[in-house]
Amino acid sequence: SDGEVAAISAADGDRLWRVELERPLSGGVGYYDRSLYLGGADGSVLQLSADDGVVEWDAAVSSEVLAAPAVSGDWIIVQTYDGKLLGFQPGADEPAWTFTSDVPVLTLRGTSTPIVVGANAIAGFGDGKVVAVDVNSGNVSWESRIGIPQGSSEIDRIVDIDGAITQQGIELFVASYQGRVAALDSRTGRKLWQQNVSSVTGTHVGFGNVYVADVDGTLSAFLRTGQGVRWQNIELGYRQLSRPTPVSSYVATVDFDGYLHLLSQVDGQIVGRAKIGGDAARADMIAHNGGLIIFADNGQLLAYDLETLD
């Protein structure tokens, strides 16, 4: 968040390069064709060379960018905190198109990370909707409501989609706060199935399961076919779990106290645990060569071999 960007060797942890951008960074890092894409708290979007960190492109947007831009072909897709989805062409100062969602009075601080599927840019918004926008025209291809606001207070009616949307084939898996986890047809937005859940970290897929960490600490494996729940683990209640990440035959999550937990993808039993430090790790973990790469909230970048976990 302090404007430092570094490239670290996944093999041995050596630093390959480091740059200071002198601006606060607020989103993750996107990658496409040897370039990195980042968003800033000052309402900026940047493209850096993945080889040396040199800034290749810099544009201004209407609000801070809290998630990594998505890039596909000739389009850079940016989601902003004020409910907009923007389509930039490389090198352009202004977006070619803008989609603006309805922003509720009260929302969580965050946004989903947009993805590109075929000709559509797909993102979740604070009003509980998933929207697909044609990247070439900026027209809405479809909308699907995942979270339905309920209750008398603005807090009760928060239904943000802030977590990751997972694509597998033609299916999309998405979860909302105080709403549902659902499977959608990526071509039409048609809802294939849904289950009640409240999540701010989104979904992941493995072993025929759709994994979701509920805000109450329940980690669930829903059958990808929509035929119910394969298993649920309630041992990590209210520990603010990170997005579940499949790796090998396990699913991994980090809690608010800095503990990494490994669960069996088959039955959800906890099979390993390690202390990664004094902080949580809200950034998505990366499964790499049968292990995990974790970026902790305190700025540490860690690589774990699963065989070393107790």
Model-derived segments and spans:
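Short loop/turn segments that connect beta-strands within beta-propeller blades
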Residues: S9-D12, S49-D52, Q89-D93, V135-G138, ...
